[in-house]
Amino acid sequence: MQCLDDKLGQRAKDIDRALPETRNAVISTTSDGTLSVVRAASDRDPGTFYLYDAAKQELSELGRARKGIDPKLLSEMRPIRFKARDGWEIPGYLTIPIGRPATKMPMLVVPHGGPYGPRDVWGYSDDVQFFASRGYAVLQIN
């Protein structure tokens, strides 16, 4: 990401450094720029909100988007690439049920329109996590 404002760019770097395994977005900032609300999300967390104090360079948790979801119990979404018969490399995401060996399990393949337009992205998905929790590997092909 390229920020046009050096202060905001540094703030984004500080937040990403403090929350390294999440996709982070500043969703609101005070008019003087000292406080920001940050949403951090991942493949296993639909969103946790933080207050970022720029003067102190501190994050404090405000709350979670879905309190009933324990990220430690959810499955990881891994980016993958494989070659098609015609030699084209196809990107996608593979979610293997947590705590299961990645062999001989049923798989749900989630196709969509394309190759341009709709696509899957790395992040939390209720549907993917539901099927993974029931023992299915989930393959999302872009």
Briefly describe each language-model feature range.
Residues 27-142:
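Serine-hydrolase catalytic core recognition
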